[in-house]
Design a protein with these regions (language model features):
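Core AdoMet radical
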Residues: 104-123, 127-220, 225-230, 255-260
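Conserved, mostly hydrophobic/aromatic
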Residues: 43, 67, 96, 192, ...
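Short, electropositive alpha-helical surface patch
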Residues: 149-156, 185-191, 239-255, 309-324
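Conserved strand-turn element in the central/C-terminal portion of the radical SAM core barrel
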Residues: 141-145, 216-240, 259-274, 295-306
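Active-site glycine- and acidic-residue-rich loops that bind
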Residues: 170-175, 232-246
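N-terminal pre-triad scaffold of radical SAM enzymes
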Residues: 64-105, 112-136
């Protein structure tokens, strides 16, 4: 499969581009970002064969403006808001270097087993009353199995019966049968981040592989669920790694792409990494939009690094956001303030279930 190819990110010279038959607009960077945005609106798609270094050298303001035009054309003004509940916390056996919930790291992460169903359903109903589009149960661990998985299925069945909000799950490496059972219980989206590029993945985690991530996402797509997958930037990766991640997600046909900016957590191996600048985050969001024009580009952790909790990102290609409580990083924006901010930008924050009422 094409997404298994290990990419050589030695960027093409203009002569190599000319000889390879790649569109001449890439030669010597004669195209600006706004022209490229129009080509994407007209049907062009960015691939690994293109000179991806363009996105690193073009004018940031033009890149963001072009990304916003692409967003407006393909996604429109609707902003998809999702909220999550940490259904099971801590003691994760995986060694992800960024994560407070890994048992390999030394953090003050709260530890508890799967939450009572009434706690989850109450949170779901609260989010529905506030106008959030979808609600997700997220659990720590390699995969949710056994009695706890059965509890999750029952909780989703209850929420599907009593609520109209869309339902999502993030429960690790589930098999086909488990994904099917969640789907039957009312879950229509499944989240499973690839985290970074194939090249960089072993620097971030060694207890599972990039290929296992890809296989899980293929199962999600085969089940007919929406696939939500993105990653974290600021973990010591290169710009080429970020571009690779964006292209890999496009090749997989991912529907929703959360972009997290690392908020270093004390007690993790990445605790001393510098925080990203706003310009770095915006450039990343923007080129993810160019490369994934049909996907929801979703703001996730790290919004505190952006002006006004990310308002500028919604003018740079973002079309969705996690809102409210955000697991183990500080949540700087509440649901109501997010909705007010987006309404002030003339964005549509009315969930479908309110429109249907």
């Amino acid at each position: 499969m094409i997404w298994y190819t290990i990419v050589n990110f030695k960027m093409k010279t203009s002569l190599q581009i000319e000889n390879s038959g790649v569109s001449a607009v890439w030669k010597e960077k004669v195209m600006n970002a706004l022209d490229l945005a129009q080509e994407i609106i007209d049907g062009r798609r960015i691939t690994r064969e293109d000179d991806l270094s363009f996105f690193l050298t073009c004018d940031l303001k033009e890149l963001c403006e072009g990304a916003d035009r692409i967003r407006a054309h393909f996604i429109g003004e609707k902003v998809d808001l999702c909220s999550i509940i940490n259904g099971r916390s801590g003691r994760c056996p995986e060694d992800c270097k960024y994560c407070a919930q890994s048992a390999h790291n030394h953090t003050n992460c709260e530890v508890y087993d799967f939450l009572p169903e009434e706690t989850i359903v109450e949170a779901c109903k609260m989010n529905e009353s506030e106008g959030v589009d979808r609600f997700s149960i997220v659990t720590a661990g390699r995969a949710l199995n056994g009695e706890e998985f059965e509890k999750a299925v029952h909780a989703f069945e209850t929420m599907h019966r009593e609520c109209r909000i869309d339902l999502c799950a993030s429960m690790g490496f589930l098999n086909e049968e488990q994904l099917h059972r969640l789907h039957e219980a009312g879950v229509n989206s499944y989240h499973h981040n690839i985290e970074t590029s194939r090249r960089n993945f072993p620097n971030i985690c060694t207890t599972h592989t990039y290929d296992q991530k890809i296989e899980t996402l293929k199962k999600v797509k085969a089940e007919g669920m929406c696939a939500c997958s993105g990653g974290i930037i600021g973990m010591g990766e290169t710009w080429e790694d970020r571009l690779d991640m964006a292209v890999s997600l496009a090749e997989l046909g991912i529907d929703s792409i959360p972009i997290n900016a690392l908020m270093p957590i004390k007690g993790t191996p990445l605790e001393n990494l510098p925080q990203l600048t706003e310009d770095e985050i915006l450039r990343t969001i923007a080129f993810f939009r160019y490369i994934n024009p049909l996907a929801n580009i979703r703001l996730a952790a790290g919004r505190a690094l952006l002006t006004n909790d990310g308002e500028i990102a919604f003018r740079s290609g973002a079309s969705a956001s996690i809102t409210g409580n955000m697991l183990t990083t500080a949540a700087c924006a509440t649901i109501r303030s997010d909705r007010e901010m987006l309404k002030s930008m003339n964005r549509d924050v009315t969930p479908d279930y309110w429109k249907e009422a």
